[in-house]
């Protein structure tokens, strides 16, 4: 078996930034920061959202968004919507369409006259 092929598995302290909830879980992450939790020092990884702050698990209808991603997306979407042309289809060049229709009608007249002779 090859040596040094698998990442080191260790216990890491995860901290939810939105709610402040802390929990220890095994992980291959290698964070630089450390913090004491229940008398033991663990490497620390900060989460933007976890089961303690996610609306599905909390039962609330609001999303706790510490970074403002939702607002940024809404603003960007509104700007894009305003900048885009109206939802109506673009007007076609009616003169080109009329000319092609007239040519087809003329061909039908010519073939109809030729078939009578």
Swiss-Prot record:
Matches recorded under Gene3D superfamilies: Ribosomal protein L31
Region (Disordered): 75-117
Pfam families cross-referenced by the UniProt entry: Ribosomal_L31 (PF01197)
Biological processes, Gene Ontology terms: translation
Quaternary context: Part of the 50S ribosomal subunit.
Record's protein name: Large ribosomal subunit protein bL31B
Sample GO molecular function, one term: structural constituent of ribosome
Gene: rpmE2
SUPFAM superfamilies reported in the protein's UniProt record: L28p-like
Transmembrane annotation, as ranges: none
Family statement drawn from the similarity comment of this UniProt entry: Belongs to the bacterial ribosomal protein bL31 family. Type B subfamily.
Ranges annotated as biased composition (Basic and acidic residues): 100-109
NCBIfam families documented for this protein: L31, PRK01678.1
Entries under InterPro entries matching the protein: Ribosomal_bL28/bL31-like_sf, Ribosomal_bL31, Ribosomal_bL31_B, Ribosomal_bL31_sf
Keywords tagged on the record: Ribonucleoprotein, Ribosomal protein
Listed GO CC annotations: ribonucleoprotein complex; ribosome
């Amino acid at each position: 078996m090859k040596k040094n092929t698998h990442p080191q598995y260790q216990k890491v302290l995860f901290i939810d930034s939105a709610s402040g909830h802390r929990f220890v879980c095994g992980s291959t992450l290698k964070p630089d920061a450390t913090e004491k939790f229940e008398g033991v020092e663990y490497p620390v990884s900060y989460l933007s959202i976890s089961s303690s702050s996610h609306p599905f698990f909390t039962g609330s209808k609001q999303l706790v968004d510490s970074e403002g991603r939702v607002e940024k997306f809404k603003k960007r979407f509104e700007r894009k919507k305003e900048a885009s042309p109206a939802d109506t289809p673009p007007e076609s060049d009616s003169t080109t369409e009329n000319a092609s229709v007239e040519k087809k009608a003329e061909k039908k007249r010519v073939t109809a006259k030729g078939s009578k002779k």
